[in-house]
A protein has these predicted regions:
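Transmembrane core module of solute transporters
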Residues: 1-20, 27-154, 158, 162-164, ...
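Intrinsically disordered, low-complexity segments enriched in polar/charged residues with Gly/Pro
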Residues: 21-23, 94-95, 207, 214-216
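Hydrophobic membrane-targeting alpha-helices
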Residues: 22-23, 66, 191, 240
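Hydrophobic transmembrane architecture of multi-pass small-molecule transporters
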Residues: 154-160, 172-248
Length: 248
């Protein structure tokens, strides 16, 4: 964080972001038509999508390092072990879409974020030597919660704009969700790597951590739990935002 490049980038962002908003607001052919955010439902749904990105994407990185560092898996095995999260989304997304079309999307989207928050909180009980099935269950539950959120929330967003502006709406959604993902990875990795010796981090990140002792891994496990609590709290905020958005 003390690197001049990082500091310079943050300063540039603070200066350029308001300028970008001004240009987009008053330009003849804006890249992003900001007037779509005047609709309260769309604004709330995109805010929830941003929070979803903030609370989900870093989780994949955290667990890759957990499997490699704490459990001694090679990178390929660590990646395969993330499959329950994708399977959870695969099952819940279409069912959530059908439910939202019939019963509405607001409550279901909020419930999805709540389910994910519970699973993220449960992940803080994992130890370095926990059996795989425990983390697999919680990853699957996060995936189910994400699927319950994504389909209804996206449908609500797209339903607020006319057909000829849905491309703009989809672009805005992806921009904010990806922004949340980038910020999530930056902040969570800062938490996870805090106070962990560089040689230990190198072994964890490179997938050669099988020789690390429990004492060497303890700072990493502690930081991982802290990061998971942060992600769980962020998901609760997302659930509240989803629940408070207008019905129509």
């Amino acid at each position: 964080w003390n690197d001049p490049v990082v500091i310079g980038g943050l300063i540039a962002a603070v200066v350029l972001l308001p300028l970008w908003v001004l240009i987009e607001r008053h330009g003849r052919a804006p890249m992003l038509d900001l007037t779509i955010f005047e609709n309260r439902l769309f604004a709330a749904a995109t805010a929830a999508a941003f929070i979803n990105g903030l609370s989900r994407f870093a989780l994949l990185f955290v667990f890759v390092f957990y499997y490699q560092g704490a459990q001694g898996d090679d990178p390929i095995t660590a990646g395969i072990k993330l499959a329950p999260m994708a399977l959870g989304m695969l099952v819940s997304s279409p069912l959530a879409g059908i439910w939202a079309d019939r019963r509405g999307s607001r409550t279901l989207a909020a419930l999805g974020m709540l389910v994910s928050a519970i699973a993220l909180a449960a992940m803080t009980t994992l130890q370095a030597n926990s059996p795989y099935w425990q983390s697999a269950v919680w990853l699957g539950l996060v995936g189910i919660g994400s699927g319950m959120f994504n389909s209804p929330n996206t449908a609500a967003m797209m339903g607020t704009v006319p057909a000829n502006r849905r491309g703009i709406a989809a672009g805005a959604r992806m921009m904010l969700q990806n922004t949340g993902a980038v910020l999530s990875i930056a902040f969570v990795l800062a938490i996870v790597t805090s106070a962990v010796p560089k040689d230990v981090l190198f072994k964890i990140f490179s997938g050669v951590a099988s020789g690390l002792s429990d004492a060497q891994l303890e700072p990493f496990i502690h930081n991982m739990r802290t990061a998971l609590w942060v992600l769980a709290a962020t998901s609760l905020v997302g659930a509240a935002v989803s629940l408070m958005r207008p019905k129509s």
